[in-house]
Each structure stands twice: as C-alpha cells, then as structure tokens.
C-alpha cells in the first residue's frame, strides 16, 4: 500500500473489485487513507481495506487475482520468503506485479551507501546531515556527485526519499540472472516486463547490430540491453502461477473478434497520451477505427479494418481484443 498511490489507481481501474492494501507503516497508511478518501477510490470498488500488516502476515487472505508489490521485497532480510508469501496467495490464474532494484544502474548509490557506512553516519538525522554534506563536499567533477545531481537530486529533495535511497539499512538488488533465480525459488513464471519498451534492443541499436540482437532469444536480448544501458536502476515485471501463453490470432479470428479501446489512454475524443503518459501518434485511419470501436463495441473488427491495422494497434496496446 505505501502512501496509497497504486491502491488509488487500482481501485479506479478495477471497478467492483475487492481491494486490500497493507503496509507496516502507520504513517504511510494515514497518507494512503486520506489519498483514497479524497479521490473517492472506495466508491469505485466493492470493498477497500487498508491495514497495518506485514506481507509476511497474510494468513486467511486471498487468493488474489492481482497482487501489486512495489519497492518492498528488496528491503526484506529474506526477500525469497516474502516472494513465497505472495505466491501462496495468488489465484491459479492470477498475476503478481513486482518492482525490484537492478544492481548495475545503482552503482553510484551502492558506493555512496558504503561510504556513509564506513563513516559511521548511521540511519537517522545524523546520517541524513552527513549524507547531504557529502555531496556538497565532493569535488564538482566527482562521478558520484555528478550522478547524484543528474539522476537523483530531484527525487531526493525530501529527506524521507534521501534516507530511503542512501541510508536504508536493508537492501538487495539484482541482475537478470539473479532475478530469474529469485523467481524460481517461489515456483512462479515470468510473464513479461511492465515496461517492455525499456528492454527492446531497438531502443539502443539499429542496422546490422539490431538485426543480430533481434535474432537472439528474448532472455538474451534482455541481457544485451542490461549490458548496454547501465542506467537501468530497477526491474518491473509480471509473474504468474501458471505459464502465460501469448494468444495467436489468425486473420480469420481477428475478423470475428470485437474490440475494446485501451481504457488507460488519455485524451478526448481522441487519445494523445498512452497508458504510460507517453505521446502517441495516430493516423487518420487509426483514429477513425478507435472511434468506431468505442461507438460500436459489438461490431466485429473484420467489418471495420484490415488484419494488419488491427494487429498494429494491438501491438501498440491501443486496442484490446475480445472473442
């Protein structure tokens, strides 16, 4: 639950659901409750509970169709125990979304943490004072100071965020190999990144290099991206209790399917921002198709567009398919 950001939007995006948010911090829960009260989140769902509990203490809860755990497991003394606790409460067809620290993109954070530890800075107000003084004292050209200014200074303006980044007493970060080994400890299956564009080699390569990259199996493509982009500081991804098979739609099946415009797009009457608030470009034909699908939800797609146009919008996550 934390301060309720994800609890809030999950309520609004899943009307009629039963929602449980847990956190060990009473202060964070107070913020979460006020946030959800102001937004009217509880009115969107069948039930909303926000409780001061550990994710290790969820006996009698579940099974859940969807579990969202962001920035929690990597702060546990035994992250694998926390993962198994969540896995035990996942419905057979459910999804678990995790956010975990990535090792390579946090090198400057790890060095700063180690330096402050060697200086016996502590984790309280003294550590906060010394940590901020450290960045003010380091020479301007120092890589740690430069990376802090360029990447983290804005996020760390609040003292709580600075302490969470540089003074947290318990933290684990992962590379891809360790990440998949971690997933296997709970018997779960990797179901994809929630930010797949970050792991697309086309973001970094072109020409022959991109062709060679795209010929690799998916996991090796991701390993390549991990090596080429040292600024990736976290993993965000979905896990499932059972393997998820990607649906393969023939031209005939596409023609018989009905469509649903992605409900997380922004802009009326035509979307201008995607589900991640990224600008999207639509041709006149695409704009017309999305409008028609919204106005005629029971119309089969074959009567409205070609299979190639439908597939393109589906691949861009602008159009969802219904049998």
Where are these regions (language model features)?
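Short, glycine-/aromatic-enriched active-site segment of Class I SAM-dependent methyltransferases
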Residues: 109-115, 148-169
């Amino acid at each position: 639950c934390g301060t309720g950001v994800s609890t809030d939007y999950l309520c609004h995006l899943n009307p009629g659901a039963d929602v449980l948010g847990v956190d060990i911090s009473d202060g964070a829960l107070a913020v979460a409750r006020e946030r959800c009260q102001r937004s009217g989140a509880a009115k969107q769902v069948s039930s909303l509970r926000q409780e001061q509990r550990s994710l290790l203490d969820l006996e009698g809860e579940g099974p859940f169709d969807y579990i969202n755990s962001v920035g929690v497991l990597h702060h546990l003394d035994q992250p694998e125990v926390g993962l198994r606790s969540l896995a035990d409460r996942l419905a057979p067809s459910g999804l678990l979304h995790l956010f975990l620290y990535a090792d390579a993109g946090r090198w400057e954070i790890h060095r700063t943490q180690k330096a402050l530890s060697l200086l016996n800075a502590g984790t309280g107000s003294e550590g906060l004072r010394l940590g901020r003084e450290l960045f003010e004292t380091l020479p301007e050209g120092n890589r740690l100071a430069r990376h802090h200014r360029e990447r983290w200074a804005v996020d760390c303006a609040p003292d709580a965020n600075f302490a969470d980044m540089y003074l947290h007493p318990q933290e684990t970060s992962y590379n891809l190999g360790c990440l998949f080994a971690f997933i296997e400890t709970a018997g779960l299956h990797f179901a994809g990144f929630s930010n797949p564009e970050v792991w697309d080699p086309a973001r970094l390569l072109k020409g022959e290099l991109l062709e060679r990259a795209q010929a690799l199996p998916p996991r090796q493509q991701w390993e390549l991206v991990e090596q080429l982009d040292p600024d990736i500081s976290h993993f965000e991804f979905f896990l499932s209790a059972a393997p998820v098979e990607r649906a393969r739609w023939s031209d005939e099946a596409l023609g018989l399917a009905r469509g649903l415009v992605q409900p997380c797009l922004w802009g009326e009457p035509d979307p201008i921002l995607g589900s991640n608030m990224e600008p999207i470009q639509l041709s006149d034909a695409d704009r017309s198709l999305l409008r028609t699908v919204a106005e005629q939800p029971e119309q089969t797609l074959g009567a409205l567009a070609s299979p190639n146009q439908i597939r393109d919008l589906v691949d861009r996550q602008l159009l969802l398919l219904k049998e």
